[in-house]
Amino acid sequence: SRPKPKSASLPSLDPKMAEHYAASGLSEEEIKLFRKTMADLAEQIRTIEALTQQVPKLRALTLNTDLVDLLHAYFEALVQAPQRLTDAGTFVYQQVPNLLDLMQKYAQITHHEVKTADTYETLDKAFETMTNMAGKIRTDYQAFIKDDLDDLDSDVRLAKKHLEPEKTHETEWPTWAMINKPIWRMIY
C-alpha cells in the first residue's frame, strides 16, 4: 500500500504559542519553519510509538530505556525553547529519523516467516544499536536541559540559604580587625 499524503498545511497557530514564539525572538518565517519541523518530528515520534506497540522486542527496548518518554520530553523542551532548534539539530534531523528507519526495518524483518542465524544476528546488532541510540539521545537531552537544571540548582541553593537561621552570636564582641576595617570594605 502507498503512504497516505500528508496535509501540506499546519493547524492554525494558537495565540499563546504565537506569543511564546515571538517572545523567544522568532520571526514569522522562523515560526513557520519551526512549526513544520516540529510537525514532522511529532509524526516520526508517533510512528516510533506505533512500532513499539507492534513489536514486542521494540516495546521492551522502550521500557528499558524510557525511550518514548525521553522523545516526548526532548520534544517538549524544544517547544519551550524554540530558539535552540539548532542546538537540537542532531536530535531532530539525525537521531529520530535514523532511529525510526532502524525500527521500521527491524519490524519488517521481525515479521518474516523464516529467519536464519544471520537474520537473528542482524536483529541483535540492530537492537543493540537502537539501545545505544536511546542512550545517546538521553545524554544529548540532558545536555540540552543542563542550563535549566543549573538554574534550578542555583535557585534551590539560594532558597536553602534563606531558610537557614542566621548565625549570629549575641555575646561575640567585635574584634580589633573588624572595627579597624575601612567602611568601603564592609560594604563590598
Task: Annotate the PLM regions.
Residues R2-L78:
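Membrane-proximal, non-transmembrane interface segments of integral membrane proteins
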Residues T62-Y188:
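Soluble C-terminal extramembrane regulatory/interaction domains of multi-pass membrane proteins
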